[in-house]
Amino acid sequence: MAIHVKGQLPNAHFHKDWQRYVKTWFNQPGRKLRRRQARQTKAAKIAPRPVEAIRPAVKPPTIRYNMKVRAGRGFTLEELKAAGVSRRVASTIGIPVDHRRRNRSEESLQRNVERIKVYLAHLIVFPRKAGQPKKGDATDVSGAEQTDVAAVLPITQEAVEEAKPITEEAKNFNAFSTLSNERAYARYAGARAAFQKKRAEEAEAKKK
């Protein structure tokens, strides 16, 4: 490592038969070749299916990275339900499922539901048994064409909005208290509904 700041000059003091612990990677070019051959073998074996599955477009956590969009692990159960795909069928047609991820905004839900719908519009499912197609299987694929792409529905970054002058309304808007109030409103939704129901029952009892 190059010396770039002030400090003690590195001097490795070797002890304990250090030659035994030296690790070499002379097989790196061979491994690279075998990995490539394995990818080609897999692609030929599963053809005409795509090698990589479709992935959801997600935003990374933390304020540092959350303006970017990247590929996630799998689609949420809520996204699959909105797109009309069952959890069990999804994994059989190249749609990965991640039961842990949650949709925290309507935008993320709609974005990934749209991705699933576009994917399903281009998807051709061959029947397991020839001549016995099930619901959703393709019956006539004579006019179908195979499309070669680098990735299944590649993820593109969202357009960055130009900076705008801060308005008086934006200055007066209190984001923290607004979010806090909304969370409190959602938290007591059940209690509020129960109270209103009780009030309505009491009003009905008085009428009688």
Curated annotation (Swiss-Prot):
PROSITE patterns: RIBOSOMAL_L13E
Annotated GO biological process: cytoplasmic translation
Keyword Phosphoprotein: yes
Gene Ontology CC terms: cytosol; cytosolic large ribosomal subunit; preribosome
Residues that bear Phosphoserine: S177, S180
Any one GO molecular function term: RNA binding
Cell location: Cytoplasm
Key words, A-Z: Cytoplasm, Phosphoprotein, Ribonucleoprotein, Ribosomal protein
Keyword Ribonucleoprotein: yes
Chief subcellular location: cytoplasm
Matches recorded under HAMAP family: Ribosomal_eL13 (MF_00499)
Sequence similarity: Belongs to the eukaryotic ribosomal protein eL13 family.
Record's function text: Component of the ribosome, a large ribonucleoprotein complex responsible for the synthesis of proteins in the cell. The small ribosomal subunit (SSU) binds messenger RNAs (mRNAs) and translates the encoded message by selecting cognate aminoacyl-transfer RNA (tRNA) molecules. The large subunit (LSU) contains the ribosomal catalytic site termed the peptidyl transferase center (PTC), which catalyzes the formation of peptide bonds, thereby polymerizing the amino acids delivered by tRNAs into a polypeptide chain.
UniProt xrefs under PANTHER family: 60S RIBOSOMAL PROTEIN L13, LARGE RIBOSOMAL SUBUNIT PROTEIN EL13
Subunit structure: Component of the large ribosomal subunit (LSU). Mature yeast ribosomes consist of a small (40S) and a large (60S) subunit. The 40S small subunit contains 1 molecule of ribosomal RNA (18S rRNA) and at least 33 different proteins. The large 60S subunit contains 3 rRNA molecules (25S, 5.8S and 5S rRNA) and at least 46 different proteins.
Protein name: Large ribosomal subunit protein eL13
Organism: Schizosaccharomyces pombe (strain 972 / ATCC 24843)
